[in-house]
Each structure stands twice: as structure tokens, then as C-alpha cells.
């Protein structure tokens, strides 16, 4: 589950508090602290969601992995008996916890430095906060509120055609590889890997 969370670090944060139901989408950094890990993230100070999170209620973060439509036309079993229907393949992780508000400048600077390094790691010349004037970074930090989200439970769901016969899964791999749109190639790799593991 951590592998998906690291590969797809842009998560949906959902909470319900005295102001009602909120949802925000934000980049994350996953740490290996504690039994399930800790997620560090931030919101714009102008986003009212952060004050709701400060109440300390349980919240949910959703990490969406590869997903896509699967046509039954890819199943060889369609020609044999016709008992096939379309479906949707997907991978998702739900992380639950109680966010802790982090407002200290040192914490925020460390967080945005780590987040930037995580996202810039494959660049020829990675950008870092130290590339900008200190006074500018200080102003930018005043515009965000950080959160430390200690995960209390994790739930993952992977539906990658594992319920189909091997020949149908091979058909899915071929179909996804030929369509090659969105997450298709990543899904084809996952389905193919699971065929190999099950043999």
C-alpha cells in the first residue's frame, strides 16, 4: 500500500467537523514512522478546511492508483459462452488518522523542502527552496498550514481482473496495451505481473 501512496502522492483529504463535510486535494510526503506510517502535507491558509481539521476529528486520505474501463470484448471467454460484462479495474488506498496542525516555520520549511525534493528528484537540475530568496520563501510559508497525519489504519483495494480466468487476463493485458490511454500501460503491467505470480 505504501508503494501506491508514494507512486501517487496527490491525495484527497476528507473530513467532517463542525463546519460540515470538506474535501481537499493535496500533495503528500509519506514517512515510515509508527505502525502504519505518517503523512505530511499542507493546505493553503486561505482554505477553510484547515481550521476544521484543527478540531482533531478523524479524517480520511484517499490515494487513487491506476484505473480504467475493461471491455468484455477483450475476453476470449466471450466467444465461448458470452457470459461476460464490462468492468472497471482500479487500485486505491484509504488512510485514516487524526491530523495534527503544524504551524512552526521550521517544520513547514523542512516539509516543503522534502516535498519539493520528492517531486524534483528526476530533474536534470532539481529546484529547491534555497534557489529562491529567503524573504520570498518566508512569505510563501506564511500562506500555508502544515499537517502531520499519523495513520491509524490502512485499507487497500486492488481490482485488477484477478477474478477472471488466465486467458481472459491475458486478453486484458493485450487490450490495455493496444489501447494505451491514461493508466492502461501501468494496469497492463500489474495484471501481467499477477498472472506470472499466480502460475
Predicted regions and their residues:
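Binding-site signature for planar aromatic cofactors or substrates
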Residues: 1-199
Amino acid at each position: 500500500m505504501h508503494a501506491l501512496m508514494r507512486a501517487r502522492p496527490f491525495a484527497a483529504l476528507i473530513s467532517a467537523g463542525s463546519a460540515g463535510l470538506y474535501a481537499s486535494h493535496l500533495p503528500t510526503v509519506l514517512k515510515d514512522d509508527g505502525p502504519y506510517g505518517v503523512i505530511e502535507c499542507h493546505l493553503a491558509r486561505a482554505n477553510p478546511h484547515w481550521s476544521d481539521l484543527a478540531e482533531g476529528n478523524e479524517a480520511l486520505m484517499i490515494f487513487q492508483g491506476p484505473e480504467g474501463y475493461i471491455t468484455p470484448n477483450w475476453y476470449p471467454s466471450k466467444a465461448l459462452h458470452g457470459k461476460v460484462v464490462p468492468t472497471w479495474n482500479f487500485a486505491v488506498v484509504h488512510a485514516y488518522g487524526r491530523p495534527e496542525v503544524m504551524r512552526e516555520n521550521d517544520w513547514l520549511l523542512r516539509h516543503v523542502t522534502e516535498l519539493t525534493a520528492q517531486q524534483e528528484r528526476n530533474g536534470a537540475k532539481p529546484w529547491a527552496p534555497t534557489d529562491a530568496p529567503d524573504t520570498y520563501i518566508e512569505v510563501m510559508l506564511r500562506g500555508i498550514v502544515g499537517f502531520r497525519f499519523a495513520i491509524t489504519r490502512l485499507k487497500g483495494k486492488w481490482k485488477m481482473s484477478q477474478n477472471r480466468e488466465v486467458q481472459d487476463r491475458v486478453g486484458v493485458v493485450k487490450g490495455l496495451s493496444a489501447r494505451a490511454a491514461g493508466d492502461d500501460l501501468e494496469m497492463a503491467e500489474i495484471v501481467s505481473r499477477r498472472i506470472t505470480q499466480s502460475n
